[in-house]
C-alpha cells in the first residue's frame, strides 16, 4: 500500500512524500527506532533524497526531507554521498553541492549546513564531525590537488580545523586517538594514490602515510581495532583487493598484515562477521561480476561466497549499499538498478532469506540507524 502527502513551495513543485507499509514487527525491547537512507541521485540531476523507515509504525517514507522542509530551495542537493547520526543531529554529506546538511534526527527538520568542497564521508569523535574532502572541483585532472579532512564542531556547526592528506580521500576510521584515511587518487588516473593517511588527533596533523594498494576506497575497523581497506584497482590489469592493517606486537604503527585476493565494493562489520558485496567492472569484457560474501574477521578467511541463501539475489541488478541491523542481524542491501530511476531496498534475515523489499529514491546508497529516545 502506498500513501501520499503533498507539500507546497512558492514557485516550485514539491514532490510529495510517499508512504509504504512494511510488516516488520520489532522486538518491543529494541533500542532501534528506525533508519534513514540517503539516495544519491544521478550526478547533475539535483535529486538527492532522504527516505526513513520507522519499525514501530511500519511506515517507509520516500522523499522524507521535502515533506519536513517545504521551504528549502533545491532540497538536499546533488549526490548524497554519506549519512550519519551523532547526538541529536543527522548529517547528510552532499558531494556535488559541496555541503553537509544537518538535520534534527528525530524530526528531519533542517538545522543548518556546513560548506565543505567536494565532501565525501563523515565520522564522529569526541564532539566533532570529521569530513573527508577532495578539496578541488569535481573533475578528472592529473594535477588535482591533495585532499583534506575537515573538523566540524557539532554544537556550532563551524569548521574548527583542517588537515591535508593524500589525493582524493575517501572513508575514515579512528583507532586509539589516530585517524586513518583511505586515499584514492581517483581524479589523477592512471596515477592513483596508494596510501592510508594517519592523523594524530591531539594536534590534528598527518604523521604518516602507509603504502597499501592503489585507488583505495572503503575503510572499516573491526571489534579488535584491525582496519579493513579496499582497493578498486585500475579496472583493467590491476584487480581490486582487500587489505588488513594491524599493529605489530610491541609497536604502535599499523602495517599491512594480510591481502585478501578478491574485490570488495562495500562492506559492513557486525561482531566477528564482515558482510560484503563486490561489483567488479572489467573494461576488457565490458561486464560486471557480482558476488555477496562473508569474511570471519578473526581468521581473515572467506567463509561464504553468498550471504543471500534463498536465490533472491537474482532480483538485484546493481548492489549499491549495505547495512546490518545492530541487534537483529537483518541485512539491508540497496539496488541502484539503472541509476536514473527508482531503486529498491531489500531486507534479508540473518540467515540470508528475503523478508521484504521496498521502492526507494534514485540510487539508494547509505544507511544509518536511529535509536529510540532514552537508548542513545
Question: What residue ranges belong to the model's regions?
Answer:
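Predominantly soluble domains enriched in secretory-pathway, periplasmic, or organellar proteins
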Residues: 9-376
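C-terminal motif of bacterial Sec signal peptides marking the signal peptidase cleavage site
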Residues: 4-7
